[in-house]
Regions:
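Nudix hydrolase/Nudix homology domain
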Residues: 2-10, 75, 145-193
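Conserved Nudix-box catalytic region and its N-terminal flanking loop in Nudix hydrolases
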Residues: 5-7, 45-47, 52-97, 145
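A short coil-to-beta-strand element that immediately follows conserved catalytic motifs
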Residues: 9-10, 106-113
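Short, solvent-exposed loop/turn elements at beta->coil junctions and helix N-caps
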Residues: 13-15, 115-119
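Acidic, metal-coordinating catalytic segment for phosphate/diphosphate chemistry
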Residues: 13-52, 58
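Active-site-adjacent beta-strand/loop module that shapes the phosphate/pyrophosphate-binding cleft
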Residues: 28-33, 119-139
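Short loop segments at secondary-structure junctions
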Residues: 32-34, 57-59, 68, 88, ...
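Short aromatic/basic micro-patch
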Residues: 78, 129, 153
Length: 193
């Protein structure tokens, strides 16, 4: 038997915390089916929207970064990315800004290759992924705040081995390379919502 999943109706919303990088909200919502008129509490994190970019040089190397991540207390291998700041006119602009700030690299064109919702059970944001071909370094990185980043150039055809071996574990980076594969195979045309 097939049935349609309906949206829940939010009846209350209370901000619990307002941190620098996210706010936390408790929402009370009515279940549309099943236990009629029964309300449940849900907690939602509201971080900024995010972006990341796969920069590939003319000689086929991916510009990765290594940085320490406090959530897992380890150094991770990632691609450049970060928050879409309120003053950024678009996530594409933010991706170019993050690429430049974190690596000193630029690209003539950033191509949108996909959008994901990092954790829709708990978070309200999305992450847009861009491809930057012919990326070239024009200066040293300009780190801001608590950033401590090392650039690492890796041959594009080595990336699957890094993923399979567990050297790359950041979910948004894994999704980015999946988007790249779809883009290269020309399966569909992604569009931001």
């Amino acid at each position: 038997m097939s049935r349609e999943i309906l949206p829940w109706r939010k009846i209350e919303s209370h901000k619990i915390a307002d941190c620098k990088v996210f706010s936390l909200e408790r929402n009370r919502a009515l279940m549309p089916t099943g236990e009629a008129n029964r309300a449940f509490d849900f907690y939602v994190l509201h971080p900024s929207h995010w972006c990341n970019v796969i920069p590939i040089t003319d000689d086929g190397r991916v510009v990765f970064i290594e940085q320490y991540r406090h959530g897992i207390e380890k150094v991770t291998l990632e691609i450049p990315g970060g928050a879409v700041d309120p003053e950024d006119p678009s996530s594409q602009y933010a991706a170019g800004r993050e690429l430049f700030e974190e690596t000193g690299f630029v690209a003539n064109e950033l191509t949108f290759i996909g959008r994901n919702h990092p954790n829709p059970a708990l978070q309200s944001n999305f992450c847009d992924t861009f491809l930057a071909r012919a990326a070239k370094q024009v200066c040293e990185p300009t780190f801001k705040g608590a950033e401590d980043i090392k650039i690492k150039l890796v041959e594009l055809d080595e990336v699957p081995n890094l993923i399979a071996s567990g050297a790359i574990t950041h979910a948004l980076v894994l999704v980015a390379f999946y988007f790249l594969q779809i883009h290269e195979l020309k399966i569909g045309t992604p569009k931001p919502e």
